[in-house]
Amino acid sequence: MEYMKKYEYWLNSEAVDEKDKEELRSLAGNDKEIEDRFFKDLSFGTGGIRGVRGIGTNRINKYVIRKATQGLANYMLSFDEKLAKEKGIIIAHDCRIGSREYALNTARVMAANGIKAYIYEDLRSTPELSFGVRYKGTMAGIVVTASHNPVEYNGYKVYWDDGAQVVDPHAPAIVAEVNKIKTLEEIKVISEAEGREKGLIIQLDGKIDDDYLDAIKTQTLKTDIPGKENFKIVYTPLHGTGGRPMKRILSDFGYNFEVVKEQIEPDGNFPTVTYANPEEKAAFKLGVKLADEIGAKIVMANDPDADRIGIAVKDDKNEWYYPNGNQVGLLLLQYLLNNKKDIPTNAKVITTVVSTPMIDVIAPSKNVGVMKTLTGFKYIGEKIRQFENKELDGTYLFGFEESYGYLIGTHARDKDALVTSMVIAEMAAYYDSIGSSIYEELQKLYKEFGYYLEGIKSVTLKGKDGIEQMAALMSNLRENVKDELLGKKIK
């Protein structure tokens, strides 16, 4: 039994701390749990890793994080050793349990390999990490986060020097380097104190935060909105990283807002929600309650790493309405098309193949092109780089995917809920000032361009059994579905 060999190896490895070995010893006799923790190595995919926290090869822990980091370090050094050591890497983390520990372990491994590691003093959003890569001019970046996944999860995403998540050719090459590491003893690691003493672990100061927020603020379209001070907004970061920066942005622009006090402080236990996911209506419960109490017309919610945003708005019957990710994307696009000055003639909107086809009629109505990528915002970030390098003809205007991810501006190369929240607040206040609303503007879109309906169903399959079920489902799909699905031809 291969999983039992791995279990025994971890029990006896000098690289594993005694307290973690105690956890492993407590599993003795529980073969099912041992198998689930060790039956495979947690997969380092093309963007990073994500999984349930715990000790084992199929869990997120500091040893798995170290292995991933050693693989990335090996790739950086093989790609260009001089450049890797000169430019280094930037590291951020969210509010989740273990995130700070994993971020420091990442820095310690990089430092042990002679690569400078710039690290934020405490939690920061994913889009600020994306911004930080180009701001500091590093070769790569890492953010420790599991985004909007359940509380027991954590993870780790890798970015390249353009500030976007890694894509080809880097992604598969990094995966290959990680997979070459067979033992924990191959991983280089030094103490945090030694890394700081050698100048290889460097703490970032607050200037990067200020400059990131300044970059966001350049994306505002209307600062002088009549009656803005009377338009009430409720905001919640759902216990995540968005609270501090979003309060600052809304305050600086003079919005009348209140935060959900029970959810404003970072807390990796997410005590007030089942899932800290703005795609879930239940996540808005406290926000909507506060909005009803103070007479607010919109609630904005970010996920824990502040790269996604969901909203609740009042409809024509004064009931709460929850626009989905596609609807918010289309509303933002229409607002930009109608209010942004000097849109280039080669402007492009970028979205994914699973997002709404309604974009194909809205964007061309203003002579703006549409480009579609595979699922994942990393491909949208890749297109920005290709525009800048003149590999493709186009100027980036806006990017979005149906899963509540949007990017306005090119300060970051990943979805950014902070800049999006700022523009949504502006959009909502502006529509209110002209006697309209977000809901009413959505209905206008449908009347002008036609009605579209999309939906998502999420299915959770856990553990080894879940992985096997998923594999069987996909195998059946590939084997039995060839040219047609549900009466539709597959292109």
Question: Can you describe what each PLM-predicted range is?
Answer:
Residues 2-106, 194-230, 241:
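An N-terminal, well-structured beta->alpha segment
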Residues 15, 33-38, 42, 154-283, ...:
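Gly/Ser/Thr-enriched, mixed-charge loops and adjacent short helices
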Residues 38-58, 146-147, 237-245, 304, ...:
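Conserved phosphate/anionic-ligand binding catalytic regions in large, soluble enzymes, centered on
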Residues 82, 90-153, 249-251, 256-310:
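N-terminal small/polar loop signature for handling phosphorylated ligands or for N-terminal nucleophile
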Residues 100-105, 130-134, 152-158, 197, ...:
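Short acidic, glycine/serine/threonine-rich loops at helix termini
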Residues 292, 297-298, 321, 339, ...:
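Phosphate-binding and adjacent anionic-ligand microenvironments
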